[in-house]
């Protein structure tokens, strides 16, 4: 089974980013064989954010598609991952 790639775009001053990171980490821990996670700080890697047209954080990109702007619920993230498996 190929893994679903999750890219979580955050910034150090973002008040909602820790919640998004917690959700992503929780799902990744529950689905380790299905998910590959990359955390991207937009302050350190603005070019990557520009490639996706990201203007706000947290943003979650799944397999190259912007899926969530803001922190999703765990259920919503799991559903989005399962659609791609």
Curated annotation (Swiss-Prot):
SUPFAM superfamilies: Thioredoxin-like (SSF52833). Residues 1-85 form the Glutaredoxin domain. GO terms for biological process: cell redox homeostasis. Keywords: Cytoplasm, Disulfide bond, Electron transport, Redox-active center, Transport. GO terms for cellular component: cytoplasm. PROSITE patterns: GLUTAREDOXIN_1, GLUTAREDOXIN_2. InterPro entries: GLR_AS (IPR011767), Thio_glut (IPR004502), Thioredoxin-like_fold (IPR012336), Thioredoxin-like_sf (IPR036249), Thioredoxin_domain (IPR013766). It holds the Pfam family Thioredoxin_3. Disulfide bonds join 14-17. One of its GO terms (molecular function) is electron transfer activity. It is found in: Cytoplasm. Its main location: cytoplasm. The keyword Chaperone does not apply. This is Thioredoxin. It comes from Methanocaldococcus jannaschii (strain ATCC 43067 / DSM 2661 / JAL-1 / JCM 10045 / NBRC 100440) (Methanococcus jannaschii).
């Amino acid at each position: 089974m190929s893994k679903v790639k999750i890219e979580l775009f955050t910034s150090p001053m973002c008040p909602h980013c820790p919640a998004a990171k917690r959700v992503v980490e929780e799902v990744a821990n529950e689905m380790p064989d299905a998910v590959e996670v990359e955390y991207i700080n937009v302050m350190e890697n603005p070019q990557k954010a520009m490639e996706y047209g990201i203007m706000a954080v947290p943003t979650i990109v799944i397999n190259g598609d912007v899926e969530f702007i803001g922190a999703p619920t765990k259920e919503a993230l799991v559903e989005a991952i399962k659609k791609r498996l």
